[in-house]
């Protein structure tokens, strides 16, 4: 909605300003897109958002001489984006959350404002359900020879856990972040209650140096595939065999999951890879920072000889991510080698709420519960 459109729809400029002031919300959502509104003194206002292929900074229009700024952005239905406002005053730039938008998404770096396109709804299974009995969180410690230090791992234990039963195991990279920012415990409680997945033991790992340990690190792969499962088998009664063992991770955690399964074939039969940072350079430089160099070396080798790291792999990626091309390229490669693949592209970016919204599809593919065994 530009200044011209505002005047056309609201009459005079003064009427347009008054109408927007009364709304007291931003953005304004319609089937074709969203209109961002900022009220306040500024020399310039820019939208800072992360949609691959579009400018990272888009300028607002000022409405006349008023301290009112608007920006119309086309946004397909069911989209979701995270953003901040860049406010320029007296030559100083400040990035702020949208003051008129209560919707925010937290991540390890802080928080962003959230714009939900027309038709987007947060999945109801990501919200607490009083009918779902909550699982518990326990902490275990183990000395890792592979990593040369002690590691503390939080373990999700499902409600109604019994020592006499055996359970599948899911190991989650950045597991505490999945708890904090992707509602993982709520999702597990709900999906187990609804029989969409079986009761699982879920090991939530966290690395002190994830950009190193998750980037094709042999010691980390050995820890995840050998040391951690061995400890969990002593502490809990786990089902044997790769069909009952899974790895999950997002971004670099997706790389770590694929790498560990590839280095230790037969250890895991199920992988959940969300927005994996699968940079490769076998057909040209990866054009990313040097942090990605060890990732590219692993992915190059994986593309040459993928083998069969798992029986089933779930992949997802947001179409607003620069990683969309790398993730797409994996799908035919995996299928060519006899792996069952579920792949989803969504109108979202590289963020935790994107990964949260995919958890039902991911977990029911990796570990279908009684409900899916009946209806699929």
Model-derived segments and spans:
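Non-catalytic cap/lid and distal C-terminal segments of serine-dependent acyl enzymes
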Residues: 1-56, 63-376
């Amino acid at each position: 909605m530009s200044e011209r459109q505002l005047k056309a729809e609201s009459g005079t400029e003064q009427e347009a300003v008054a109408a927007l002031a009364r709304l007291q919300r931003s953005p304004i959502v319609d089937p074709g897109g969203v209109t961002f509104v900022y009220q306040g003194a500024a020399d310039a206002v820019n939208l800072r958002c992360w949609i691959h292929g579009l400018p990272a900074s888009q300028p607002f229009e000022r409405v006349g001489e008023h301290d009112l700024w608007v920006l119309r952005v086309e946004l397909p239905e069911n989209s979701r984006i995270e953003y901040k406002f860049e406010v320029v005053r007296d030559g100083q730039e400040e990035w702020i959350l949208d003051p008129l938008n209560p919707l925010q998404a937290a991540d390890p770096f802080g928080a962003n404002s959230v714009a939900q396109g027309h038709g987007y709804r947060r999945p109801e299974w990501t919200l607490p359900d009083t009918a779902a009995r909550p699982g518990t969180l326990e902490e275990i410690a183990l000395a890792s020879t592979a990593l040369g230090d002690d590691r503390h791992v939080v373990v999700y234990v499902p409600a109604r856990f019994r020592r006499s039963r055996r359970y599948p195991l899911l190991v989650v990279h950045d597991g505490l972040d999945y708890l904090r920012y992707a509602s993982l415990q709520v999702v597990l409680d709900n999906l187990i209650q609804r029989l969409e997945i079986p009761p699982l033991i879920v090991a939530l790992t966290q690395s002190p140096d994830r950009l190193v340990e998750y980037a094709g690190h042999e010691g980390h792969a050995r820890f995840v595939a050998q040391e951690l499962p061995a400890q969990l088998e002593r502490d809990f009664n786990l089902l044997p065999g790769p069909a009952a063992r899974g790895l999950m991770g997002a971004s670099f955690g997706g790389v770590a999951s694929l790498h560990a399964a590839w280095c230790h074939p037969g250890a895991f039969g199920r992988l959940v890879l969300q927005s994996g940072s699968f940079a490769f350079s076998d057909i040209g430089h990866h054009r990313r920072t040097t942090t990605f160099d060890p990732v590219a070396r692993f992915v190059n080798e994986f593309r040459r000889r993928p083998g069969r790291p798992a029986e089933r792999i779930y992949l997802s990626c947001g179409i607003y991510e620069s990683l969309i091309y790398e993730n797409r390229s994996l799908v035919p490669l995996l299928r060519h080698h006899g792996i069952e693949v579920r792949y989803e592209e969504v109108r979202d970016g590289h963020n935790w709420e994107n990964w949260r919204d995919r958890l039902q599809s991911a977990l029911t593919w990796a570990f279908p519960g009684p409900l899916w065994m009946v209806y699929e």
